[in-house]
């Protein structure tokens, strides 16, 4: 695997059709922005993430760098994991070339645009932006100090000097813009109003977006003429690691008392038909997450709300039984999820790209086809 093979794959997928993207891909050396030691999203026999060291296996490292479809993981557990094969959560990466180019195409980036990048990480994405608009028009923010130092060093070594800020990207940039484009490189659940405030009228905000239930959308918003609201549709799929302050977390503290009932539907119909269905359901129950337990006849699924006050467990094997569903707390979370599933089916199982978000100072809401048609209604 090398740059030429990666380039051909991107061209074949239609991801380098804009001349500036081809030029930027050819100019910016991805290898200069990938550390010598990285992890791959491939598990070894012991359930650990595969570790690749350039000094020990330069060919494996280069294959990882130029794989068109796979990200390279540069940090686990916010830096708490040392070098070597390990378990842990991905907390920083160099995104796969295909999603990088797809996002840049959706950004509709003009030569004279001023750009705010949230999460510059390794600096690779930042360098591509600099190639298009010039380093003097790029402001990039990174929350992790260690990652920021590495990214800044790699950008400088490659000859790029955009304005780099270490801080919380959800607050935008000190001084406030205005920016023609805001591009985020981590998934979020709530669009920060600061990004809208710091955007020009008709400016574009592009971000991975998800819910506690499902993390799968790439959202493209346009700021309206008042500069106080942004709305737009999901333009494709993406699954990024969470922006740090919006990671879904649950401190479960449900009451001991519970109620039992049967399920109206096989949970496999609700949970086993793919991530696009999950995404549509999640837009209706954005504060609900689920996890599976057990195997075979003992398999079951647990749903919890983000407040930690309600939980529901549903058995798969005999979902029709009178005690197959067990609920704790004030919310019947499984009832909410199945209602969302029913709504999705009644709408004809709409594709992710028919959904959209409107965001403003007073919050955000999801809709289907047009802003007046709220999800679930």
Model-derived segments and spans:
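Long low-complexity, intrinsically disordered regions
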Residues: 287-292, 296-315, 320-324
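C-terminal target-recognition/interaction regions appended to catalytic cores
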Residues: 309-377
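Glycine-centered structural positions embedded in regular secondary structure
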Residues: 172, 229-241, 309-314, 320
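Conserved nucleotide-cofactor-binding alpha/beta core module
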Residues: 87-206, 212-213
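Short amphipathic alpha-helical segments enriched in hydrophobics
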Residues: 14, 29-33, 184, 341, ...
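Class I SAM-binding transferase module
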Residues: 183, 189-300, 367, 375-376
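Class I SAM-dependent transferase core
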Residues: 1-116, 125, 147, 160, ...
């Amino acid at each position: 695997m090398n740059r030429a093979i990666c380039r051909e794959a991107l061209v074949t997928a239609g991801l380098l059709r804009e001349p500036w993207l081809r030029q930027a891909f050819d100019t910016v050396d991805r290898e200069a922005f990938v550390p010598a030691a990285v992890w791959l999203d491939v598990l070894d026999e012991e359930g650990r993430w595969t570790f690749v060291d350039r000094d020990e296996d330069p060919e494996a490292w280069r294959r990882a760098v130029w794989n068109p479809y796979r990200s390279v993981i540069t940090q686990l557990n916010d830096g708490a994991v040392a070098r070597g094969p390990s378990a842990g959560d991905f907390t920083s990466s160099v995104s796969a070339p295909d999603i990088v180019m797809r996002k840049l195409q959706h950004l509709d980036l003009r030569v004279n645009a001023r750009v705010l990048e949230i999460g510059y990480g390794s600096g690779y994405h930042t360098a591509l932006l600099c190639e298009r608009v010039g380093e003097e028009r790029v402001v990039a923010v990174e929350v992790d100090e260690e990652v920021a130092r590495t990214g800044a060093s790699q950008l400088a070594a490659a000859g790029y000097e955009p304005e780099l800020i270490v801080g919380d990207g959800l607050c935008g940039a000190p001084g406030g813009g205005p920016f023609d484009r805001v591009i985020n490189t981590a998934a979020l659940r709530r669009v920060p109003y600061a990004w809208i405030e710091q955007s020009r009228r008709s400016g574009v905000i592009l971000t991975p977006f998800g819910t506690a239930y499902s993390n799968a959308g790439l959202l493209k918003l346009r700021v309206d003429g008042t500069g106080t609201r942004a709305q737009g549709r999901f333009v494709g799929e993406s699954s990024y690691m969470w922006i740090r302050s919006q990671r879904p977390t649950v401190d479960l503290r449900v009451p001991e008392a519970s109620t039992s009932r049967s399920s109206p539907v096989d949970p496999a119909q609700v949970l086993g038909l793919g991530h696009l269905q999950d995404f549509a359901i999640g837009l209706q129950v954005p504060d609900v997450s689920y996890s599976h337990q057990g195997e075979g006849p003992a398999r079951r699924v647990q749903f919890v709300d983000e407040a930690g006050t309600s939980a529901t467990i549903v058995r798969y094997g005999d979902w029709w039984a009178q005690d197959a569903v067990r609920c704790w707390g004030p919310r019947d979370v499984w009832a909410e999820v199945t209602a969302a599933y029913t709504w999705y089916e009644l709408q004809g199982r709409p594709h992710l790209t028919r959904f959209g978000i409107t965001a403003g100072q007073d919050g955000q809401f999801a809709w289907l086809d047009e802003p007046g048609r709220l999800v679930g209604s």
